[in-house]
Amino acid sequence: MKRSILALASGAFILGAAEFVMMGILPQTATAMHVSIPAAGHYISAYAIGVCVGTLILVFGRKVSPKHLIILFMAIALVGNTLSAVSFCSPMLLVARFISGLPHGAFFGTATLIAKTLADKGKEAQSVSMMVMGQTVANMLGVPAGTLLAEAMSWRLAFAILAAWALMTIVVVILWVPSIDPIKDAGIKGQFLFLTHPGPWLILLAVFFGNSGIFCWWSYVSPWLQKTGGWSATMVPMLMVLAGLGMVVGGIVGGRLTDLWKAGATAALSHGIALCGLLLVFLLPSNHATTALLTFIIGFALFFNSSPQQLLMVQAGEGGGELIAGAAVQIAFNFGNAIGSIVGGAALTATAMNYHFTGIAGAPISLLAVILLVLYTRRYEARA
């Protein structure tokens, strides 16, 4: 892996860990902030809302070097994670999580452009997948480590370490990432012209619905494993490693398959796998074997679609809208996360905390993603 891509992957690691670690430490933060588990799910939603708002940075940063934008995003991540580590009440943690989410979509939009620009010809999707790999490694190692720290010491330590990592990443980005020219300045309106076509909207809606469905379940994976799977709290970090391994494998397979096959079809396949997994959460009897298997499968599906969807949108935005297009995927992804967390929490409240229903609540939403991507593939990729 090129050092420049490694530096970008380090940033992706921070943002991935900051976003997903909350799923593993939700019970501890709920206890510390004196709120219920469904109410603590709002910490996930706050991050996701920050992602959506933070993309506005790109609208006004279009004339800035992408490298300098990456440094800015890491500085914001440093502030957000520091505040999360020292939060003493629920409103403060909500604000801290919002700030932590601000750089997320903008980072991935910018980093995707850099990775694509620095890639060897014909290996653009693999280069993007290597950058995104930082996020998948965060899920395989960072999230379980954070969960373990929360069990053994304090959930605050996880955010403190992420803040220190953000500072280190600023240094390696300065040293290793080459400066590339800003994208063509198409003006504020020009950056959004790609959204006048239906294709990008099909992709974005698919990302939104696909992740809404998955996060109905994933937002509550830690208590699901314990309450329905019978796993002890000390085993949850190991199961987070299993989920992260699924994400890493999914990211690698998705990147390679996208370069060899059609990106839209690859993304449709990934959401189909997630749909099957969510149905099985509801249908299969809960025991150690089934919960572990489903944790791996749905984790695999979650990052199988990252590279194809990210690449499709950056290509759709060519001509001045690449940064906004790349960030738009993360907006849809995280807006989906926020809605999924809320829907999953509502399902739990309505069923007296029956965690099986997080799967059946998410399945029909994921089905919409499959339908949208099949439509996209037939309309745009069948001609290729």
Regions found by a protein language model. Give the residues of each.
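Helix-loop-helix hairpin linking two adjacent transmembrane segments in secondary transporters
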Residues: 90-92, 121-177, 220-224
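Paired small-residue
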Residues: 80, 91-100, 289-297
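Intracellular juxtamembrane helix-capping segments at the cytosolic ends
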Residues: 106-119, 304-318
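Cytoplasmic helix-loop-helix junction between adjacent transmembrane helices
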Residues: 96-134
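Helix-to-loop junctions at the C-terminal end of transmembrane segments
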Residues: 54-66, 250-262, 348
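Conserved MFS/SLC helix-loop-helix module at the cytosolic interface between two early adjacent transmembrane helices
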Residues: 53-91
